[in-house]
Amino acid sequence: MTVFEKHASLIMLLEKYGFSLVGENLNGERVYLKDRRNLDFSDPCKAFPFLSDRVDHAGCIAIDMGYHDTMFASSELAKTLQERVDRSVANGLKKVYIGSPYSLAFQVGDPVFIYRKFTGTQGRPGYKSCITSYCLVTRIERIKTRGRELMSYEQYRRIIGNKSVFTDQELLEKYIISDDLTLIELLYYGFFGAGNNVNWVWLKNNDCWPGTHPLNFRYSREQFDRILQEGNVNVENVIVD
């Protein structure tokens, strides 16, 4: 990738996502390169969009379809009219999930699938609820537990920034009303695309639906690879040595 020195903000973004300066063109453009043979997996942004071959498990996050379609706008479905709200979270690579889980089967650095939960009334939910995307967990913060505040509202709001699907008022209400509140920051690694999403029926029939709450799913490496393949993803182009 080439960029002129005056484009400082773009250069900062390239360097944040693992591109290195390797030279200059005759016209003064800087040449930046990202080498998949030399990735820094200690920093998810620098390794993006690749995952380390050391991955041995993955988690899952279920999101109601209305929120999903705004938060993951690129994760399209075939033959489905998806309603979206125009918010900045749709365009960013970083997303924030906010919920009240009792427990989580994943931690920072783990990949997770995004499961679009069908909440409509038309059609069969088993075919309309599906995994559409995969992310990497970059941060987990307990905001409140058993009614006790572990973080001020200002701190909580600052971490979220523009990465949530919720409005300011909704975020405030969650902070006030919820006894337990957890923030999960995600880096949006990829999506399957219309016609490739992996529905609940396939997951159940292929031993990929453990039967507990999705936040407690712990997929093995073999299951993780199998779901990616079913989503028409070339695993060798995602998981590298």
How does the language model describe each region?
Residues 110, 133, 184:
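Residue-level detector of short, conserved catalytic/binding motifs and their immediate flanks
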Residues 1-2, 6-77, 88, 129, ...:
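Contiguous surface segments at macromolecular interaction interfaces
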Residues 102-122:
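Short coil-to-beta transition motif at edge beta-strands of beta-rich domains
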Residues 81-89:
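Active-site-adjacent bridging/hinge elements
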Residues 92-102:
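Short alpha-helix capping/helix-loop boundary micro-motifs
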Residues 117-119, 136-140:
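Histidine- and/or cysteine-centered catalytic micro-motif in compact active-site loops
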Residues 124-136:
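Short coil-to-beta-strand transition motifs
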